[in-house]
UniProtKB/Swiss-Prot annotation:
NCBIfam families: polynuc_phos, PRK11824.1. It comes from Helicobacter pylori (strain G27). It is found in: Cytoplasm. Its cofactor is Mg(2+). This is Polyribonucleotide nucleotidyltransferase. The gene is pnp. InterPro entries: ExoRNase_PH_dom1, ExoRNase_PH_dom2, ExoRNase_PH_dom2_sf, KH_dom, KH_dom_type_1, KH_dom_type_1_sf, NA-bd_OB-fold, PNPase. PANTHER family: POLYRIBONUCLEOTIDE NUCLEOTIDYLTRANSFERASE, POLYRIBONUCLEOTIDE NUCLEOTIDYLTRANSFERASE 1, MITOCHONDRIAL. GO terms for molecular function: 3'-5'-RNA exonuclease activity; magnesium ion binding; polyribonucleotide nucleotidyltransferase activity; RNA binding. It holds the Pfam family RNase_PH_C. Its EC number is 2.7.7.8.
Length: 688
């Protein structure tokens, strides 16, 4: 294959254009070291009639890319893994704001990882491969985009670190954008400590990222512009509104429109605007319902922006920096290890905490790791339809739910002191009017504390928004659902009083300037201080019920005794677990026994196991080498027979000893035998 080589931002990327998958609108083979990704873009020639951007992004990992066969019973890639879904979202969120507002051609971007050497960054590589493929497709006047990752090791920022360096970093900052501005950010702190990053340092990291993106995007445009397809879709002038209808709305229905804007709940607001549209349609048949709805949307959006930018007042009458009222309740669910109900305005999150053992950890297979990894801290976010007043069934977790859960997990992960502890937090969104993921962070942090988990500090989250008109703009703290829908930016920021532990930024514009982002960071810090003050007050009222919380008892036995605790076919350990209602983890090489459950049951289980092993030792002590016994055949196995001994316990008569004497045994037979050895707590027998 012929490759085009581009050197920028500490990496050498290679692109083979239009040599594979040639029936796609555009395709390329991307190579970085030993990592190879096939990127393709396919576009349907007929636009859809619905009012949405029909863009689909699929990032797919192939097990063979790392020389592996898929684990599990079915040896074929199946349902998408979380990493694949999150990476698909990452790329989708980068490109979506760059498309023209009235682009309606079904478009699919597919990225297949064909080879991966573990050291190279799959997400940066996939986004860059997708960016060039989309640029070559030339389906719309879309700017060149690129991505970079910033790490921080020993107070020094590093652009595009490899996996080994990232594992040493206290910062994981992923940024994508054009050469002029940023349009997507994902950040989390890393390490054993909280490692919250202060706002001035965050700005410095973002400036470094912007410089990297500018360099890469400029090179992409210079190198790949000659290879672009013919432009498929030219941006139109947009919707042409009927001025008479707009005047009608402003003069006769303006008060009703304001009432709809000021309605807090999404369902209530939709009902108000539906009634307005229905009323106008009945009174003025010369206007179509679609035309009325478009015009209503325009008047609504214009008025919301005017209120915020000119009057400095928001639809719910809050000031720009004002956070909605907060109410926190704890210990609502008596059988869970913790439960926190966090209500902020009309957004309500119930976070439930449960502690577990190593067996409860989620195991993942990944191209990024040679062996399956254990996820010990899990955060699951659920967004049932009733939380926004919708009547529909609850199904499997959506991409959005996975993304919000992942964001909350990233925000809280470094606040946990003991990284070996297995913890599951579940956020049930009971009511939503914006910022539900950040409500989940606040409730989740308190739920960790209420579960008896040692944390470095409480972590709070707030969603920031922005509304702009020309050069004028306003930044909003703790945005509502309406402000999120009608605004230009959704900037979620979580952290403590010292700095930021996680953030996520999406925009509906082609990008956001750094000075606006920095202002949002500083404004978010003030909001965070306010929220943390309320959270600390709530924390003081939480009474941790240690008697109800599971406790863990760890002790060691001789490694060869572990098989005795397990028993034949797991019989003994199953009986212990069922009898005492505990969880047990056993480590054969070290002899470590870990018991988890109710404190009283755990102590009784430990006592039972030690007494059981002691009784086995006593049984062995009753016998001596060369002692002749009258034993009874208990059970026949492939390798011999287990015999019940007269003074208790059992011994093994191996098959070769039986064959040597040409003896055929049945269960229940009595036989004379001789003790020949003691091996790892077992009695070996021979025929006497």
């Amino acid at each position: 294959m012929d490759f085009i080589t581009i050197n920028s931002s500490n990496k050498t990327e290679e692109f083979a254009l239009k040599q594979v998958a040639k029936q796609a609108t555009s395709s390329l083979m991307y190579r970085l070291g030993k990592t190879i990704i096939l990127a393709s873009v396919c576009v349907e020639r007929e636009p859809v009639s619905e009012d949405f951007l029909p863009l689909v992004v699929q990032f797919l990992e192939k097990s063979y890319a790392a020389g592996k066969i898929p684990g599990g019973f079915v040896k074929r890639e199946g349902r998408a893994q979380d990493f694949e879904i999150l990476t698909s979202r990452l790329i989708d969120r980068t490109f979506r704001p760059l498309f023209p507002k009235d682009y309606r051609y079904p478009t699919q971007i597919t990225l297949m990882v064909l080879s991966h050497d573990i050291e190279n960054d799959l997400q940066v590589s996939a986004l860059n491969a997708a960016s060039v493929a989309l640029f070559l497709a030339h389906i719309a006047p879309i700017k060149s985009v690129s991505a970079c990752r910033i790490a921080r090791i020993d107070d020094e920022f590093i652009i595009n670190p490899n996996t080994s360096l990232l594992n040493q970093s206290s910062l994981d900052l992923f940024v994508s954008g054009t050469k002029e501005s940023l349009n997507m950010i994902e950040m989390r702190s890393l390490g054993q400590k909280l490692n919250a990053l202060e706002e001035p340092l965050m700005l410095k990291a973002l400036e470094l990222a912007q410089k990297s993106l500018k360099e890469t995007c400029t090179l992409y445009e210079e190198v790949f512009t000659p290879h672009q397809n013919e432009l498929l879709f030219k941006e139109s002038q947009g919707i042409i509104f009927n001025e008479r209808l707009l005047d009608l709305l402003k003069n006769q229905y303006f008060d009703e429109i304001i009432k709809g804007i000021e309605s807090s709940a999404l369902s209530e607001r939709e009902n108000v605007f539906h009634e307005i549209a229905k009323k106008i349609s009945e009174a003025h048949s010369e206007f179509s319902l679609e035309e009325i709805e478009w015009s209503l949307e325009k008047v609504k959006k214009t008025e919301i922006r005017r209120m915020i930018i000119q009057d400095k007042i928001r639809p719910d009458k809050r000031a720009l920096e004002e956070v909605r009222p907060i109410l926190i309740e704890s210990d609502l669910l008596p059988m869970a290890h913790s439960s926190i109900l966090f209500t902020r305005g009309q957004t309500q999150s119930l976070v439930v905490g449960v502690l577990g053992t190593d067996n409860d950890a989620q195991t993942h297979e990944s191209l990024e790791h040679k062996t399956p990894i254990k996820e010990r801290f899990m955060f699951h976010y659920n967004f049932p339809p009733f939380c926004v007043g919708e009547a529909s069934s609850i199904g499997a977790a959506s991409r959005r739910e996975l993304g919000h859960g992942n964001l909350a997990k990233r925000a809280l992960e470094t606040s946990i002191k003991n990284k070996e502890q297995v913890i599951r937090l579940v956020s049930e969104i009971l009511e939503s009017n914006g910022s539900s993921s950040m409500a989940s962070v606040c409730a989740g942090s308190l739920a960790l504390y209420a579960s008896g988990v040692e944390i470095h500090d409480l972590v709070a989250g707030v969603a920031m928004g922005m509304v702009s008109e020309g050069q004028d703009y306003a930044i909003l703290s703790d945005i509502s659902g309406l402000e999120d829908a009608e605004g230009d930016m959704d900037f979620k920021i979580a952290g403590n009083l010292e700095g930021i532990t996680a953030m996520q930024m999406d925009t509906k514009m082609s990008g956001i300037q750094l000075e606006i982002l920095y202002q949002a960071l500083l404004q978010a810090k003030e909001a965070r201080k306010h929220i943390l003050k309320i959270m600390h007050e709530a924390k003081e009222k939480i009474v941790i019920n240690f008697s109800h919380l599971p406790t863990t008892e760890i002790f060691n036995v001789a490694p060869d005794k572990i098989v005795e605790i397990i028993g034949q076919g797991g019989r003994v350990i199953k009986e212990i677990v069922e009898k005492f209602e505990v969880k047990i983890d056993l480590n054969k090489p070290s002899g470590e026994v870990k018991i988890m459950g109710n404190k009283e049951r755990v102590l009784k289980t430990k006592e039972f196991i030690l007494n059981y092993l002691h009784s086995l030792d006593q049984e062995l002590e009753q016998y001596t080498i060369d002692e002749v016994l009258e034993a009874q055949v208990k059970r026949i196995v492939d390798f011999g027979a287990f015999l019940s001994l007269p003074k208790g316990g059992e011994g093994l008569l191996r098959k070769q000893n039986m064959d040597r004497c040409q003896v055929v045994l049945r269960e229940g037979d009595s036989i004379r035998c001789r003790v020949i050895s003691f091996n790892k707590g077992k009695i070996a027998l021979d025929l006497a």
